[in-house]
């Protein structure tokens, strides 16, 4: 039975949630595995991992619980960019480690699959993609991972 808990309860000790740094590495690797044409459109996009969203972000979105937001796109999406606009901060995607881990603990999805979903969804906001487009990218990613 491969999913059975270890016979020794102390065997759980080395199991732990990924740190901020480890989750950044995972997010970077997931990004590198996304379809090349999709990644090519993400020039100058910064991916940042933090434990929780800031109070300002929660207030902006009208969200009460810091656990209700897994990721956030901050910047000007490509459909809304203007050549005449003043120089701005780079577009960023924030992944929120603790809410992602909480979601992971409550669902039967792999942590990597959750991060793929959040990352693709937030990048989708950057490009103004439809939900169907984002689902197709996730499916393509899943197919590629299945071939590895």
Regions found by a protein language model. Give the residues of each.
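Catalytic glutamate of the conserved HExxH
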Residues: 118, 122-126
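Active-site rim/adjacent substrate-binding subdomains
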Residues: 1-114, 126, 130-136, 141-146
């Amino acid at each position: 039975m491969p999913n059975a808990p270890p016979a020794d309860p102390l065997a759980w000790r080395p199991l732990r949630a990924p740190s901020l740094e480890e989750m950044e590495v995972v997010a970077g690797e997931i990004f590198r595995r996304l379809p090349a044409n999709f990644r090519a459109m993400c020039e100058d996009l910064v991916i940042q991992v933090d434990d929780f969203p800031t109070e300002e972000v929660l207030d902006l979105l009208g969200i009460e619980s810091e656990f209700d937001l897994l990721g956030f796109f901050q910047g000007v999406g490509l459909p809304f960019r203007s050549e005449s606009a003043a120089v701005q901060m780079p577009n960023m995607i924030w992944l929120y480690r603790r809410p992602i881990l909480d979601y992971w603990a409550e669902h039967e999805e792999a942590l990597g699959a959750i991060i793929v979903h959040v990352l693709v969804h937030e990048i989708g906001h950057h490009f103004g993609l439809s939900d169907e487009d984002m689902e197709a990218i996730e499916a393509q990613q899943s197919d590629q991972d299945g071939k590895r």
